[in-house]
Amino acid sequence: MLRSDAVTKGIQRSPNRAMLRAVGFGDSDFGKPILGIANGYSTITPCNIGLNDLAKRAEEAARQAGGMPQMFGTITVSDGISMGTEGMKYSLVSREVIADAIETACNGQSMDGVLAVGGCDKNMPGAMLAMARMNIPSVFVYGGTIKPGKLGGCDLTVVSAFEAVGQLTSGKIDEVQLTAVEKNACPGAGSCGGMFTANTMSAAIETMGLSLPYSSTMAAEDEEKADSAARSAEVLVEAVKANIRPLDLLTKEAFENAISVIMAVGGSTNAVLHLLAIARTAGVDLSIDDFERIRQRVPVICDLKPSGRYVTVDLHNAGGIPQVMKLLLDAGLLHSDCRTVEGKSLKELLADVPSEPPAGQEVIRPLSNPLYAKGHLAILKGNLASEGSVAKISGVKTPVLTGPARVFESEEDCLAAILDKKIQAGDVVVVRNEGPVGGPGMREMLAPTSAIVGQGLGDKVALITDGRFSGGTYGLVVGHVAPEAAVGGTIGLVQEGDSITVDADQLLLQLNVDQAELDRRRAGWSKPEPRYRSGILGKYARLVSSSSRGATTDHAD
């Protein structure tokens, strides 16, 4: 019995079949599984510009494997293009829109399974949220990573262009050099090339078994990526037959495996937010504290940008995520019995993967010689973040900083101050009212952090925010501060010049103001007026949960 029988079987469904005949169904097709192809193709961004070819390959393969594919579109927002603008407020919102769209199309048409094709950052968690909500057989196809740009013998990514802006304002480069970086940073199709958010989330999905082995690190423009899309469709047909569903795979152990891999590869802070959201939707008891627990035992073994030397295609050439997983598995750092969409256990999947990283490469290190002995995503708490905050500490030379607060009510005000050279070594920059409710939309702060790095202050200044950071951010940065300012969090009580301690060693984020003074400030605090009362941002601000619970919109806190 298929779910799609609800629209294809029986005399009463003759009108339904009439419409299906108009889109290509014949007599022999009724009774085949109807498979949604959720296509994120868009010319908005290089991340998604190649997705149509992958979706068509998957569509063809699904039909040849005995399914009836039905393609439909979903949206994307380009984080890189909207970064530093009001448009960035729509980025995290788009995760919910993508999830809602896929759920609506698949459930509205009684589809038997779904293959989602995505590229830019929110495509991955958006698709995963939909898959967890629907719990129908599902496979994710990642659009692939962009190849590195080249300039003067150096690899470039889009983050190189953001940092070049700071280098220009500090006099390190001129406009000719800035333009050269701009023209060479993004050479073609694919998602941003370091271990930024898109590649982090695709690695997590591969680890959790909802995409195929090696698929998360393939280059977008290589033929093996198209072949992988076709194979993914074949696997989906088999998953429908075997009734393998997302909630069979998305167990607590699978999430722990994903966190372990994210730590090992040096992945994005956004993975914390997205995995919390997916777990909540899947009914899995995952908390922000689980990330810290796993961080303590899993080292960083991949030397990847933004803080390292290499890009994701280099990781692929060194063995990809399966090689990383095999090293962790052999060390007892992964749950070996987790299943994949192909019906295999993780142990079975990795049986033929070498137990040592390939010789002659420095992208993946052995666990005996890690880049960092512990994971790089630290969970900081204190009176500034009673529900927690997320710090990315890989490559940080100064993990402890106590300094005066420089308070900004928006990203724009902060960036202007940095570019005007008003931020000095030792400052603790506070950007607030950028959280899920306050922004709304929890913008990423890549422009300010890149400007700080570009001016040579990356190891000398801390930045904390109730907003987010791009996967391309590095330095002493602390995001996802919860509770956020807009709902009464302590970050909203900070005043210019207050002493703040950021201590990544002791996992502390503390406002050094006595409790009596904090109580006085809190008594005088009033909830700010919403920045938007209508439209999708107004709706989002009314519905969204705390970042410490994934910033979802379909669960009441």
Curated annotation (Swiss-Prot):
Which residues carry out catalysis? S470 (proton acceptor)
Q: Please tell me where [2Fe-2S] cluster binds in this chain.
A: C47, C120, C192
Citing just one GO molecular function, the answer is:
magnesium ion binding
Gene3D superfamilies from the UniProt entry = IlvD/EDD C-terminal domain-like
State the EC number(s). Answer: 4.2.1.9
- In Pfam terms, one family for this protein is ILVD_EDD_N
Q: Which UniProt keywords apply?
A: 2Fe-2S, Amino-acid biosynthesis, Branched-chain amino acid biosynthesis, Iron, Iron-sulfur, Lyase, Magnesium, Metal-binding
Q: Does the keyword Iron-sulfur apply?
A: yes
Question: Part of which pathway?
Answer: Amino-acid biosynthesis; L-isoleucine biosynthesis; L-isoleucine from 2-oxobutanoate: step 3/4; Amino-acid biosynthesis; L-valine biosynthesis; L-valine from pyruvate: step 3/4
**Which residues are modified to N6-carboxylysine?**
K122
The answer to whether UniProt assigns keyword tRNA-binding to this entry is no
Q: Which domain of life is it from?
A: Bacteria
The reaction(s) annotated as catalysed by this protein in its Swiss-Prot or TrEMBL entry are:
(2R)-2,3-dihydroxy-3-methylbutanoate = 3-methyl-2-oxobutanoate + H2O; (2R,3R)-2,3-dihydroxy-3-methylpentanoate = (S)-3-methyl-2-oxopentanoate + H2O
Q: How is the cofactor bound?
A: Binds 1 [2Fe-2S] cluster per subunit. This cluster acts as a Lewis acid cofactor.
Q: Which residues bind Mg(2+)?
A: D79, D121, K122, E444
Could you state one GO biological process linked to this protein?
L-valine biosynthetic process
Q: Which cofactor does it need?
A: [2Fe-2S] cluster; Mg(2+)
Q: So what family is this one in? A: Belongs to the IlvD/Edd family.
HAMAP family from the entry? IlvD
**How does this polypeptide assemble, per the annotation?**
Homodimer.
Summarize the protein's role. Answer: Functions in the biosynthesis of branched-chain amino acids. Catalyzes the dehydration of (2R,3R)-2,3-dihydroxy-3-methylpentanoate (2,3-dihydroxy-3-methylvalerate) into 2-oxo-3-methylpentanoate (2-oxo-3-methylvalerate) and of (2R)-2,3-dihydroxy-3-methylbutanoate (2,3-dihydroxyisovalerate) into 2-oxo-3-methylbutanoate (2-oxoisovalerate), the penultimate precursor to L-isoleucine and L-valine, respectively.
- Name of the protein: Dihydroxy-acid dehydratase
